[in-house]
Amino acid sequence: MINIKTLLVATILLFSYQFLNLQATEENIKDGKYNVEVFKTPSCGCCYGYVLFLEEEKFKVKQTDMRSLHSIKQKYNIPVEMQSCHTTIMGKYFIEGHVPFEAVDKLLKEQPDIDGIALPGMPIGTPGMPGDKDE
């Protein structure tokens, strides 16, 4: 039986590899239609880095600092094994962790019938995290 972690990771990989075959244009994603909210703890520098990354991609970002993100993770039914240091809400989707733009872009263009996507942990070289992906 496939567990939810495997399913979500497979979904992220699928998004990353097939984003060139999408119908919506990049301008539709970046024209300000997507207001996003990032829930994070006040002291997390990498979370702030992800906010800056989203703003560079022309998203309108609202930051909500919280001492504990447990209630947000619970509200959006994010499995414990898929949780990361911050949760972003984009329309009807959650984006958990340092998910690359290609995956976010594909999610918003295709609008699949899922709750969200996740990249658990804090992988080196992902948006908001220092280092190169090759490390």
Residue ranges and their predicted role:
Residues 8-18:
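Bacterial N-terminal signal peptides
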Residues 29-57:
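Local sequence-structure signature of Cys/Sec-based thiol-disulfide redox active-site neighborhoods
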